[in-house]
Amino acid sequence: MVGIVIVSHSRKAAEGIFELAAQMAGEGHKMVAAGGMDDGSIGTDAIRILQGIQEANDGDGVVILADLGSGVMSSEAAIDLLEEDIEVVIADAPILEGAVGAAVQASVGGNLAEVVAGAEQAWNLSQRE
């Protein structure tokens, strides 16, 4: 199963997004919330993200969803730190809607490209239609 790492500057935001996406995905998901700093402050930590990638990895790849630009930079740093051969993609998607789309695709057995597409299709959602 493709793993998912949710990267937010806020631990609470990452955990809330995780909770919602996990509810949509159902049992057996491989998602990790990697938000905030160890001291509870706002920020992103490449080591925490690296650990999230390793935890979420099941051999089928990992998709990262990040909230802001420096979350993407920390995610890129985490990927650079990987010693294992894990295929990791940072999805270009809004973090909440993208996490839900990715989680649903992963839960039905989607491959890495399908899970990334599930996340990135969130740009096409309209709340008014």
Model region roles, listed by residue range:
Residues 1-129:
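N-terminal loops that bind phosphate or other acidic moieties
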